[in-house]
Amino acid sequence: MLKYTDYDIVFQEIPDEVTLAVNLSGCPHRCKGCHSPHLQQDIGEELNEGALSRLLQLYEHSITCICFMGGDAHAEEVCRLANYIQMGWKGKLKTAWYSGNSNLHPMATGRFDYVKTGPYLEALGGLNKKTTNQRLYRFTGGSFKDITAEMQK
């Protein structure tokens, strides 16, 4: 079951977007130096269409994007909820996923406007470091384009 612990409006995770970042628990990656180790636990409330709709109704006039922060243990469910947002909000909200997996999930294509891939490796840093192993992709023209360099300006 996909669960979320909290959420916040953020400005740096996705370029040029005001993003509702929803933190998902049950992370399987256990990255050394993780900034949110509590998200490795199976905690929080179920994130389903009803819970997501309630969140979006509260913030839809304040945000341009929703980002699922994690959820790799339930990747198909994250992709399904992204599709639900696209259909229900008819493209008015962009969708993003911060995944710790090294590769794009096969179901991500067409469901997300942005996807971050790669586990956090403390020695390499996050997306804002030129040494990072992580990548940020934007879906454009039917495929994902690497825009990681935009995060390093």
Range-by-range predicted roles:
Residues 48-52, 80-83:
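Charged helix-capping and loop-helix junction motifs
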Residues 79-91:
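Surface-exposed amphipathic alpha-helices with a cationic face
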Residues 22, 31, 115:
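Conserved, mostly hydrophobic/aromatic
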Residues 18, 111, 132:
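Residues that flank catalytic or metal-binding motifs in active/ligand-binding sites
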Residues 36-48, 58-76, 91-104, 114-139:
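Core AdoMet radical
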Residues 1-23, 28, 36-41:
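N-terminal [4Fe-4S]-dependent radical SAM core
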Residues 139-153:
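Charged phosphate-binding loop/patch that engages nucleotide di/tri-phosphates or the phosphate backbone
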